[in-house]
Amino acid sequence: MIAELLSSALGLLLYLNTLGADFCYDDSRAIKTNQDLLPETPWNHIFFNDFWGTLLTHSGSHKSYRPLCTLSFRLNYLFGGLDPWNYHLVNVLLHSAVTGLFTNLCKALFGSGCWTLIAGLLFASHPIHTEAVSGIVGRADVGSGLFFLLSLLCYMKHCSTRGYSLSSWCWILCAGFWAACSMLWKEQGVTVLAVSAVYDVFVFHKLKMNQIISVVFKEKNVSFFFSVGLLFAWGVILLGARFYWMGNTPPSFSNSDNPAADCEVLLTRTLTFFYLPTKNLWLLFCPDTLSFDWSMDAVPLIKTITDWRNIHTVAFYILLILLAYSSLKGSAIKRDCNGKVFMNGKQNTNGHSCQSDLEHKNAEQNPVIASKLENGVKHHNSHEMQLPSTENIVVLALSLLIVPFVPASNLFFYVGFVIAERVLYIPSMGFCLLVTVGARALYIKAQKNILKNLLFYATAALIVFYGLKTVVRNGDWKNEEMLYRSGIKVNPAKAWGNLGNVLKSQSKIDEAENAYRNALYYRSNMADMLYNLGLLLQENSKFSEALHYYKLAIGSRPTLASGYLNTGIILMNQGRTEEARRTFLKCSEIPDENLKDPNAHKSSVTSCLYNLGKLYHEQGQYEDALIVYKEAIQKMPRQFSPQSLYNMMGEAYMRLNVVSEAEHWYTESLKSKPDHIPAHLTYGKLLTLTGRKNEAERYFLKAIQLDPNKGNCYMHYGQFLLEEGRILEAAEMAKKAAELDSSEFDVVFNAAHMLRQASLNEEAEKFYKLAAGLRQNYPAALMNLGAILHLNGKLEEAEYNYLRALQLKPDDAITQSNLRKLWNIMEKQGLKNSKT
């Protein structure tokens, strides 16, 4: 157990610096905005939705069915909410456990010597694991790896006990159960069944390729083939259920996710897809350059035969074929330890375990599955079990390296990425085995101790360098800004775009704008980046430029509902109501089929309908507004916050004098969000209208309590008090409102009115002056300022404002009448003669 404990401890220690990290990249959608984690969402939704919370049968679903991983996120949320520390802790503990199990697997292959420990330490420290462990969504790969190893180890136990019916079949049942669990953590987990079959055929029974056919028809081998047949049948059942559950339809991805898959040129697709495994293997060999995302142009397409990367591809497949052939062809007589034979599965050579491949010479002529067969069953002496030969370990290592990678290879179906580092978590087990078995073979062949020591220390140095790289790379995953900055050299378009979002959230507006423009420099047709830049410009009142980028975003992706939404809002605010209406209508007609995030799309469509209803409402078309609001309610997704929509429904019914319906929707608004201030105010007005004055006052006071710094709340309460004849209280509320919202003309102007009604003319004058300053060319503001100055005896100032008001509105009868009265007073006081 020492090797397992040391390896697990290293796996734990190397990732301790991730515990203080934040949610990063895909964590946001899989955890922070995933409705399946919330307590109010039924538990069984996890088994019908994909990893991102989208219904699995939806055309826009990624078809990533990982319910056990999502369940673990939900448990994290249940006990710790959205505190990332808890999520990271689970990931680190899982990686430590996987490392221990992998080391235990190595013990079955290498014995209890140092090579087992080396393999375990290599796996614990390999930097390719940082995305899987440091990124919380990588838990899918780590968890799948845990159950993958449990399944494989159980099947190995089944092989060693075959013939003892009860224990043997218990082990194979456990292997099948853990395989299913592995697949339910992540899809590639099902490949453990194929790896188990490879172990049984080529490692446990040491069959060569030319021996497999000859043993199929021998009755004495029935138990062996029954085991392999069970693996095959269980795999078919799991895959069949998986395809059925996702609606028997493949996922769809955008061009940027996997450019080669979308390329129409067969040569380009073929060369690129053949090259990608080479690139993945290089990341395992030399994980110097890592990135959070390898999509878009991170790996340029190979378009011609003359591309120098094709040399890497050819070399890779030649070496792979030679390695597989040399391991499978095999002479039955191979020796690793100078012909020395193991006792109890071990032999010590200079303190390091190694083994012999000594087999009977007639093995090639008479292929036999078992060392001793009785009725087709292999019996074993558990005290004299030999360790697998080097060739056997290489075969198993290759199967661990290749088979779990096949689902990500684009061989059977296209995937939504070019390279994904976390996908290499399980294949890296095979890589670590290959490195270890290669180092061991060199160590055994080395004749001089100095060479042995050199090789040993070189291997130790590799582990140290891997560990240091892992710790440093973990630092990049500390927060999103560091992560995206680290990815600029690999995928500049994606990294700059995501960095822009982070900088914007930090209120670094100029830096964010620069980041968005850098992203568009590298890839000008990214709809999300065009939209994000437009949104940034809109929020900074650069409306014309914002409209330009929204138009480009919609041109790049015609289904971008959020682009239509914000375009419509700008047009509506600019008074271009007909253009806004057409924009909102077009948005509402966009279907959610084949969209990456259908829930976000539905939210944008619902918001478009809400704003279209508001547009009709402001134009007095209340019945049309209600029709649109009802459509919005039908289309809104679960995560949409409906309180504003319900409140506007109530407002429309109030304008149509359907008081009972209005009250229903006001209360629905408050049910959906009990602290929704507009609903408190509108419901308070309804209660006032229906004579429930005490109840109305409670709602107005509650609104003030919810937000004591919101002037509009004091103004509504002031109007209520004014209607109740409590004039001084009303004036005090109005004054408070104007002080809080001193830049809002309506609030300031109404406050001045209430203060004048309360005969607080000096205070009223102050706020009339403020209102006139806010709208300097508004005749009513100037006329009312003149009137209060008139009342306060400031006659010359009053005259000046009356005359300004008449310049703007010459035919205003009230202003003309007030001015004549003012002149009469001024004549009596000698301030003005009748000839002037």
Curated annotation (Swiss-Prot):
Lineage top rank: taxon: Eukaryota
Subcellular localization(s) per the UniProt record: Membrane; Endoplasmic reticulum
EC numbers for this chain: 2.4.1.109
Record's keyword terms, sorted: Endoplasmic reticulum, Membrane, Repeat, TPR repeat, Transferase, Transmembrane, Transmembrane helix
Pfam family, one: TPR_16
Catalysed reactions, as listed in the record: a di-trans,poly-cis-dolichyl beta-D-mannosyl phosphate + L-seryl-[protein] = 3-O-(alpha-D-mannosyl)-L-seryl-[protein] + a di-trans,poly-cis-dolichyl phosphate + H(+); a di-trans,poly-cis-dolichyl beta-D-mannosyl phosphate + L-threonyl-[protein] = 3-O-(alpha-D-mannosyl)-L-threonyl-[protein] + a di-trans,poly-cis-dolichyl phosphate + H(+)
One biological process term in Gene Ontology: protein O-linked mannosylation
Cytoplasmic-side positions: 99-107, 154-164, 210-220, 334-392, 436-449
GO cellular component terms given for this protein: endoplasmic reticulum membrane
Sequence intervals crossing the membrane: 1-21, 78-98, 108-128, 133-153, 165-185, 189-209, 221-241, 313-333, 393-413, 415-435, 450-470
Associated pathway: Protein modification; protein glycosylation
Chief location of this protein within or outside the cell: membrane
Membrane topology label: Multi-pass membrane protein
Gene Ontology MF terms: dolichyl-phosphate-mannose-protein mannosyltransferase activity; mannosyltransferase activity
Extracellular side: 22-77, 129-132, 186-188, 242-312, 414, 471-836
Record has Transferase as a keyword: yes
Keyword Cell membrane carried by entry: no
Swiss-Prot/TrEMBL TPR repeat ranges: 493-526, 527-560, 561-594, 606-639, 643-676, 677-710, 711-744, 745-778, 779-812
Family: Belongs to the TMTC family.
Role: Transfers mannosyl residues to the hydroxyl group of serine or threonine residues.
Protein name: Protein O-mannosyl-transferase tmtc2
Organism: Xenopus laevis (African clawed frog)
